Amino acid sequence: MKEGMSNNSTTSISQARKAVEQLKMEACMDRVKVSQAAADLLAYCEAHVREDPLIIPVPASENPFREKKFFCTIL
């Protein structure tokens, strides 16, 4: 019974150490305000709008996924 408790506390200590390491890593990360991140994202999207095929469709002649116009007849 004592061995089971020891194993449980070892697991708990291991999990706590992992949590502390994760928190230390997160504390060192540079933070950006949401308003600044949103402004940066909007500026990026506006700068690359001409390259976005979801906004400006790919011309049919360049679209590799266009429907093929070949017709087959089975005799």
Swiss-Prot record:
Cellular component annotations (GO), alphabetically ordered: extracellular exosome; heterotrimeric G-protein complex; plasma membrane; synapse
Residues bearing the modification Cysteine methyl ester: C72
InterPro entries referenced in this protein's UniProt entry, alphabetically: G-protein_gamma-like_dom, GGL_sf, Gprotein-gamma
Disulfide bridge partners, by residue number: none
Keywords: Cell membrane, Lipoprotein, Membrane, Methylation, Prenylation, Transducer
GO BP terms, alphabetized: G protein-coupled receptor signaling pathway; negative regulation of cell growth; regulation of G protein-coupled receptor signaling pathway
Topology with respect to the bilayer: Lipid-anchor
Record-level Gene Ontology MF annotations: G-protein beta-subunit binding
Localization annotation: Cell membrane
Propeptide: 73-75
Tissue: Brain, kidney, pancreas, skeletal muscle and faintly in cardiac muscle.
Pfam families named among the record's database cross-references: G-gamma
Positions where lipid (S-geranylgeranyl cysteine) attaches: C72
Subunit structure: G proteins are composed of 3 units, alpha, beta and gamma. Interacts with beta-1 and beta-2, but not with beta-3. Interacts with KCNK1. Interacts (via C-terminus) with KCNK2/TREK-1 (via N-terminus); this interaction confers ion selectivity to Cl(-) and L-glutamate.
Function summary: Guanine nucleotide-binding proteins (G proteins) are involved as a modulator or transducer in various transmembrane signaling systems. The beta and gamma chains are required for the GTPase activity, for replacement of GDP by GTP, and for G protein-effector interaction.
Family stated for the protein in its record: Belongs to the G protein gamma family.
Name under which the protein is recorded: Guanine nucleotide-binding protein G(I)/G(S)/G(O) subunit gamma-4
